[in-house]
Amino acid sequence: MTQCASRRKSTPSRAILGAFASARGTRWVATIAGLIGFVLSVATPLLPVVQTTAMLDWPQRGQLGSVTAPLISLTPVDFTATVPCDVVRAMPPAGGVVLGTAPKQGKDANLQALFVVVSAQRVDVTDRNVVILSVPREQVTSPQCQRIEVTSTHAGTFANFVGLKDPSGAPLRSGFPDPNLRPQIVGVFTDLTGPAPPGLAVSATIDTRFSTRPTTLKLLAIIGAIVATVVALIALWRLDQLDGRGSIAQLLLRPFRPASSPGGMRRLIPASWRTFTLTDAVVIFGFLLWHVIGANSSDDGYILGMARVADHAGYMSNYFRWFGSPEDPFGWYYNLLALMTHVSDASLWMRLPDLAAGLVCWLLLSREVLPRLGPAVAASKPAYWAAAMVLLTAWMPFNNGLRPEGIIALGSLVTYVLIERSMRYSRLTPAALAVVTAAFTLGVQPTGLIAVAALVAGGRPMLRILVRRHRLVGTLPLVSPMLAAGTVILTVVFADQTLSTVLEATRVRAKIGPSQAWYTENLRYYYLILPTVDGSLSRRFGFLITALCLFTAVFIMLRRKRIPSVARGPAWRLMGVIFGTMFFLMFTPTKWVHHFGLFAAVGAAMAALTTVLVSPSVLRWSRNRMAFLAALFFLLALCWATTNGWWYVSSYGVPFNSAMPKIDGITVSTIFFALFAIAAGYAAWLHFAPRGAGEGRLIRALTTAPVPIVAGFMAAVFVASMVAGIVRQYPTYSNGWSNVRAFVGGCGLADDVLVEPDTNAGFMKPLDGDSGSWGPLGPLGGVNPVGFTPNGVPEHTVAEAIVMKPNQPGTDYDWDAPTKLTSPGINGSTVPLPYGLDPARVPLAGTYTTGAQQQSTLVSAWYLLPKPDDGHPLVVVTAAGKIAGNSVLHGYTPGQTVVLEYAMPGPGALVPAGRMVPDDLYGEQPKAWRNLRFARAKMPADAVAVRVVAEDLSLTPEDWIAVTPPRVPDLRSLQEYVGSTQPVLLDWAVGLAFPCQQPMLHANGIAEIPKFRITPDYSAKKLDTDTWEDGTNGGLLGITDLLLRAHVMATYLSRDWARDWGSLRKFDTLVDAPPAQLELGTATRSGLWSPGKIRIGP
């Protein structure tokens, strides 16, 4: 009876067969529209675009003179130059630069640029440190010489002295067929002046291959593809309706009900979507609170910088690296962010997509996914709380910024929901919509493969539905809409780019990297266990709780073939999504830990399922539940065995952000490991005890639903960490306080960073009571200095950095500046001073010597201390060497003594009243110049004078110190000093913290010249931004290092004086030159056209 009934149920009725037979027109529409959508979508990358062309020609305006034109691609498509020999004849005897593609004094200019240089004896054409041709000057000035021709293209670089012959009588020309010899161009620079002579010409084709827009034909094809795809999906929807089971819209909106639940009236908005529970309130409040006070993700500054520049550039360029190539084919989400920048650049506004994604994920989880997992899950409050808390704890460390993992998590969940809809109701329209969702999720980033994993997990049941429907309506009416649905993403990805440009962008990224092989996937998990921000407490828990729940569920499902009221199919597909994603992640080119944020939604569903599977109703033996509790304690011990670190400024004020959390000297990890040992031991005892043992109220309470309790505890820890950070930092910068201030126009960290515009303005006047007895160092040395000299500083001591050979990119000009002054300073010192200090006004005293060592002491004269006010919160001493001091990063660091002694007025002479140990950033540059900070708030209000007391009691040559006189600096906020209009090179790490500063833009292949550079803290600058933005990798430092001189400025984080917030560097031009005028035009290019490969090689 059962088999017959089942067969009758699965056999279509005559009415349904007749309906399918009469739907011939709908089938044709689905077939034709689907094929049209598919063909047009696939053709989109090949269709022509309109390219904006740009040419750099020189001389300009008929005059000789340098011009700037820094190429965002660094090198041109081709370069030609013609120099009449008359120009050489007219040059002075000493010669000079006829032309160069960079300033001669630029950093590594000879290594990067092309020059035509005349010396007293020769005329040299050099390109990237390669001598293309060198000719004696007398030959070039002879009447036979007509002109010098230089070309540099993909075919190589060649020079030809027209009119001159080599010894064999052949034309005098030479060169190398190497495409990597194309020079970098930041302009055209020359020593020539006056009117341009006839015949002198330079021309460069700027690489603007990515500056394109669709032609009318391509635009029509895109519109046609989208319309045809929509029509095909509607036709598929009509075919789905022919089975007589109601509107597909009702089925899409109908909530998943347990199989045993009674049917009800179908409503447009299901009842479950109109309910509101305490869990909903907690989740929504948690997301909103975290949006305001929570930490941001690692690449927020990177992505915001790209989004802010995209509108001016005309495409979404990755201009921090990779030669300004576009993000395509993965990047449509960034274009949404670029549109949002038209409203505001504030963090709260820009992060709204991730907030919305998190809220929608919870709605889908609570209304669709958990009910689909079976009546046991749907009826379990602990399961809902587990999903809620795991979603929050996984979202907080990964998805509260601009990174796309939150959007991908939502896309994967929507795909899973649609696949389950398709299976439950045997409809193909939800499956087609799932294909669209998966395609757009993949179009966000390669990690969007999680949505593809959802498709693969449901592939077999979907194929069964397709086979059943194929018998009724044929194959093409069903497959064609699917093809269109899967390829319509191409109309978005290639809307303004072509197949050729996207392939070139992909080649550049793969060649430069990071681009890691599939077998290095272990690195992702290795980074997770390192005691760094990538392996911090929050990031470990966000992923490991998902992994623990996943493997626990797999084990239980394999052991128990049938679990009452748990839907095996959806449960196994959910596990398949996670396992499939772990597999697909192997093939993504990067192995960053932040990719784990894409597991947030499916991990929450997994936690809910596991909560039911380990509950007493399923695991009846307390031994098994206790074993799972022990595993949770072990997971917590592992998670807490690291720092409570958060990315960049999000960590300010957070407890234990650079150390393992402790309670009374005992690490929290140790406490949880002890609990693990107790729980594991008790589980082992239960293994040998009678089955009924261990079912007391306490054990049952602990083991009934541990997942939501543990996840809720961790969520509370994360929130408490941020709240503590705000309280400890107030009123200075913290992430949460900055977001609150944004409501009234705050500018983030720029409001709290204080800049000293003129370091020579704040020096105090020495009291001249002992002026007659001052030693040779003047008031700085006091009465009887011992061991201090005006030149007691080693060579190459620079500000806030240590010298490394060879120099890294992004270093200051001080690294390459002369090591001695041409004229001695005020006290005879020839040591260059940092921060713009004027040696003619600022004395120096140091203990460094290569000779015999001695113990050195210095007590300066008293300096008159101005009355305290809010505008002058610091006394600063610029110093170098190994100095004892305090810093946020390292706490107290030992060293030699440099303290500030303050005095009160006495009945006669001043009365010393106390000494202050400096706040010293120290960091990794203990022997560099830096500013020691002494807060006025820590001095008595009636202190009237201060003096420097310095002692170098070590006989080790490396333990030297150097000091300058104390000063009370005039400070302005960075926002006031830099403003919002001057172009700034915002390092990729800092962009979100400085939303009001104007990033340097680029358009038509030419980058804007920045006035300043803002960097993160010293370690992040050295290890992250300097190397990532290196010109070798196609980064912006390739422009600034070659064209500008950088000088670090004296800056301080308001009321957080001991913190290394980062640095502000001011750029000075090597050559004062106006921007070049470009010759712009347009050209229509096919989807396969390419001007050649971008130069990547050395």
UniProtKB/Swiss-Prot annotation:
Listed transmembrane segments: 28-50, 217-239, 271-293, 402-419, 434-456, 472-494, 541-558, 570-587, 597-619, 626-648, 663-685, 698-720
Topology with respect to the bilayer: Multi-pass membrane protein
CC annotations in GO: plasma membrane
GO biological process: Actinobacterium-type cell wall biogenesis; cell wall organization
Pfam families: Arabino_trans_C, Arabino_trans_N, Arabinose_trans
Source domain of life: Bacteria
Major location category of this protein: membrane
Gene3D superfamilies per UniProt: 3.40.190.160, arabinofuranosyltransferase like domain, EmbC, C-terminal domain, subdomain 2
Single Gene Ontology MF annotation: arabinosyltransferase activity
Signal peptide: none
Family: Belongs to the emb family.
Protein name per its UniProtKB record: Probable arabinosyltransferase B
Gene name of the encoded protein: embB
